[in-house]
Amino acid sequence: MKIRPASSSDMERIMKIEENAFIPNIQETYQTFSCRMAAFPHGFLVLEDDRGAVQGYFSSELWEKLPDNNKVFILDHDPLKVHKADGKLLYVSSFALMGSLRGRGLGKLFFRECLKEVQKSATQIDQVILIVSQEWGSARHIYEGLDFKAIRQIPGFFPSDIIPGGADGIVMIKTLEENV
């Protein structure tokens, strides 16, 4: 397995991973992923298996500061409106692995290594923020295992097939040390 920057030729596979990982009402669009890649190429990484097939992706943006409102977290938002090349806050906008790779510890390893890679090209980053659904216990386990702390809850943020009115979004943050 190797981590490398995503390219436009990966988009079809990234969309397959998106469809595999999320229910339809949460899946983000091809256009959104293309904009993320254009806004911050060093912050959009893929996990490639030994055959060269993309099996996971990690997309992120640099923000100036922690937002004081919840609107900036909206799904399918335009990263070009919020990304700041000199931002110190890394927002992980999306992260997913193909289902066949889940449950083996690869998610945590991939996520941690992506943070390290992004930090190499954006050395000013001092905090990482993300939003996760209350329904995604495995994802929360990864983030908590990497010392992310919940700082805010957004009621009904994520569409849900299980929870009427939607699942709460949990905003989590981690302050970075020299070594992630």
Question: Where are the predicted features?
Answer:
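A short beta-loop-alpha structural element at the N-terminal edge
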Residues: 1-14
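Active-site rim helix/loop that mediates acceptor-substrate recognition in acyltransferases
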Residues: 23-50, 54-65, 77-81
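Short hydrophobic/aromatic beta-strand element in the GNAT-like acyltransferase core
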Residues: 42-46, 57, 94, 129, ...
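Conserved acyl-donor/pantetheine-binding loop and adjacent beta-alpha core of acyl/acetyltransferases
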Residues: 59-94, 156-166
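Conserved GNAT acetyl-CoA-binding A-motif
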Residues: 90, 111, 118-134
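Conserved acetyl-CoA-binding loop-helix of GNAT-fold acetyltransferases
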Residues: 97, 103-118, 141, 145
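Conserved beta-strand-loop-alpha-helix junction that forms the acyl-donor binding cleft
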Residues: 99-102, 128-140, 156-167
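Conserved acetyl-CoA-binding loop of GNAT-fold acetyltransferases
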Residues: 143-153
